[in-house]
Curated annotation (Swiss-Prot):
Family: Belongs to the bacterial ribosomal protein bS6 family.
Gene Ontology biological-process entries: mitochondrial translation
NCBIfam families registered for this protein in UniProt: S6
CDD domains reported for this sequence: bS6_mito
Chief place where the protein resides: mitochondrion
Protein name per the record: Small ribosomal subunit protein bS6m
Physiological role: Component of the mitochondrial ribosome (mitoribosome), a dedicated translation machinery responsible for the synthesis of mitochondrial genome-encoded proteins, including at least some of the essential transmembrane subunits of the mitochondrial respiratory chain. The mitoribosomes are attached to the mitochondrial inner membrane and translation products are cotranslationally integrated into the membrane.
Domain of life per record: Eukaryota
GO CC entries: mitochondrial small ribosomal subunit; mitochondrion
Compartment(s) where it occurs, according to its Swiss-Prot or TrEMBL record: Mitochondrion
Keyword Acetylation: no
Organism of derivation: Schizosaccharomyces pombe (strain 972 / ATCC 24843)
Amino acid sequence: MVMYELFCITRPAANATRTSSPTLAMNIAKNCGRAILDNKGVVVDVESMGLKELAKPIKKLNQSYSFGHWWSMTFYSNPTVQSEIQRILRLEPSVLRYMIVKKADKLSDLM
């Protein structure tokens, strides 16, 4: 299995403040995690980085967003699972941006 890290920015809730709850982002993370586990992968870590101001506004669905909820997920899976995760994130209207980074081919590459 290969180690990956997923970074994602989701739109803030309609009444978002800097301390808003990350439930929208965590629901998306659960959907991605379920896809990983269904394909015999392992989710190592899910981290919420909170609501942050974006470097430049992101336009999506005829709206402009200056803030976004940032989160990341570290996981082991087969390379074919990436396409399923990308499909989930592409179809989710709350996702502003995402990126999947390959961290290591095997455990010995990390040491």
